[in-house]
């Protein structure tokens, strides 16, 4: 694990790199960059991140955040699916169907986040080199003939510093444990690659998953997609544009539909 100083330095470097790239692409991005630096890289924020990595504060803060988010999400799910929605939840290898994980379970997933990490790495799904690679997370003990539901994770990073490494590890570890196969992807970065390059890459990755995931034990007929920030935008757009030939150059007739999408900021 990297030291707090290394983590803070990395985040600052990423911010400056992003700012440099965006400013070269458009002078109008100056205000956005300054706002990002002030909001996400202010001294008090960096100090908090540094302290959290070397003290129990990280676990306490995470527990409080999980509890708050759980109340909001629970209310939304009850309003949509009814108060008994947990009884409708099924995971393929879940030993306690309908059971809602508590804060301790979430923290445990974070602690063991590498348990199923990237059992197959850097698979090429397109022509753009490293920008078109993906990793597959899965349990090594999946039953023979088993067809696991698939979750595609689209990383965030202002469409310019996105990387499949280091994002959503607790989520993918937990879903893998429940019997899912998770696929995390790289895609083209701005400003060297302008829109719609990003969404074309995401849809190309979906097409690859549909055509190949059965070889890894996945079910091509049940593919969900998620992502945060820029990844949330792209996962939403991908879910809403299945079969749009203008966003699928060279693979116009490929199946890029998904069965579910869960974007977040």
Give the positions of each predicted feature.
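N-terminal membrane-anchoring alpha-helices
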Residues: 2-91
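N-terminal cap/lid segment of alpha/beta-hydrolase-fold proteins
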Residues: 24, 34-49, 85-146
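Short beta-strand element of the alpha/beta-hydrolase
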Residues: 145-157
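Alpha/beta-hydrolase active-site loop signature
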Residues: 158, 187-191
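Short N-terminal helix/helix-N-cap motif within the alpha/beta-hydrolase-1
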Residues: 161-165, 192-193
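Short amphipathic alpha-helix adjacent to the substrate-entry channel of hydrolases
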Residues: 165-183
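The conserved SAM/SAH-binding core of class I Rossmann-like methyltransferase domains
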Residues: 183-185, 264
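Primarily recognizes the serine-hydrolase "nucleophile elbow" in alpha/beta-hydrolase
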Residues: 204-265
